[in-house]
UniProtKB/Swiss-Prot annotation:
Organism of provenance: Vibrio vulnificus (strain CMCP6)
Function: Catalyzes the conversion of dihydroorotate to orotate with quinone as electron acceptor.
Location in or out of the cell: Cell membrane
PANTHER family: DIHYDROOROTATE DEHYDROGENASE (QUINONE), MITOCHONDRIAL (PTHR48109:SF4), DIHYDROOROTATE DEHYDROGENASE (QUINONE), MITOCHONDRIAL-RELATED (PTHR48109)
Pathway note: Pyrimidine metabolism; UMP biosynthesis via de novo pathway; orotate from (S)-dihydroorotate (quinone route): step 1/1
GO molecular function terms attached to this record: dihydroorotate dehydrogenase (quinone) activity
Membrane topology per record: Peripheral membrane protein
Residues reported to bind substrate: K66, N111, R112, M113, G114, F115, N172, N177, N246, T247
EC number, UniProt record: 1.3.5.2
Entry similarity comment: Belongs to the dihydroorotate dehydrogenase family. Type 2 subfamily.
Catalytic residue positions: S175
Cellular component terms (Gene Ontology): cytoplasm; plasma membrane
The name this protein goes by in its record: Dihydroorotate dehydrogenase (quinone)
Amino acid sequence: MLYRLARAGFFQLDAEKAHDLAIQNFKRFTGTPIDLFYRQQLPNRPVECMGLTFRNPVGLAAGLDKNGECIEAFDAMGFGFVEVGTVTPRAQSGNDKPRLFRLVGAEGIINRMGFNNLGVDNLIENVKKAKYSCVLGINIGKNKDTPIEKGAEDYLICMEKVYEYAGYIAVNISSPNTPGLRTLQYGEALDELLVELKRKQAELEEKHGKYVPLALKIAPDLTDDEISQICQSLINNKIDGVIATNTTLDRTMVEGMKHAQEAGGLSGRPLQSRSTEVVRLLRKELQGNIPIIGVGGVDSYVAAKEKMLAGADLVQVYSGFIYHGPGLVRDIVKNL
C-alpha cells in the first residue's frame, strides 16, 4: 500500500527524474528510522551458484544503481544479490535526454541511457564505503568512444579495478544502446574477448588470492543458432555464468502503445516470454554445466518460478521492482 502511494507520486514525474530522486532518497534515508518503510526481514532460501552462497535467489539487475550509491538500501530490502553498474573505465554522460520511458499499460520500460555512469573509480569508492551482507555483482562495459575493436581493453581495465571488491563480475556485451556492442556476442569476436577475460581472471586470482566468477550478459534478440554458438564459447572458455537477458529491440508486444516506437531497449513484462525462452534454450545447450541468471519480466512469484522451471538458478528484477516495489522481493522469496 505504501509503495503504491509512493509510486503514484513518482509516476507523475519524468521517468529519469523519478529514478534520480529515488536514488537520492535511498542514499539519504538508509540507516535512519525512515528506512523501516522498505527494510525487510526475509526467510533464508540459500542457493549455491558460481561457487558463491546467495542468501536467496532474487537479485537486483544492473542499471538501477549504476554507480553503487545505494547498495545498503537494496541489501536492507532483502535482495540475495545486488548487481551495480553498468560501469565503464571513464565517466560518460550517456545519450541525449529524454532517454527513459514508461509503458505503464504493459508494465514495461524503454531505455536508451547509453551506459551513463561516473566511472569505475567512483563506483569502487562507493563500494568500499558500503556495509552489506548480500552478494555484490559488478557489471562492466565499454566507453562509447572506445572503438569496438579495442573494446576488450575497456573490459580488462574495469575488471582489474573491480575484481577485489566484486562477488562476481558481469560482462555486458548486449546493451542495444552502445553502437556495435552486440557484435561482441558473435563468433571470433566473442571467443577472443572471453580468452582475454579468462587470462585476466587467472592473473587477478593469483594477485588477490580469491576467485571471482565471470558471468556473460546476453541479448534476447538472438537466433537459436546464435544461442548455440554462444553456449559453445561459454563452455570452451569455462565462463562461470550467463545472464539472460538484456533488453529487447522487438516491439511486437507493445505495438500501438504510447512511447512504443521510442528507440532503445524494452524491458519488463513484454520481455517476459522471450527471456524465459532464451533461458530454456540455454539450459538445453549447457546441460546444467554453467549456471543461468534469469532476468526479463520477473514481476511476480509466478514469473520467477517460470524462469526457474525453464532452467534459471537465480533471477533478477528491475522493471518489476519499479512497478511493484520491495514487496515483490518479499513475495518471490517467501513463496519459493
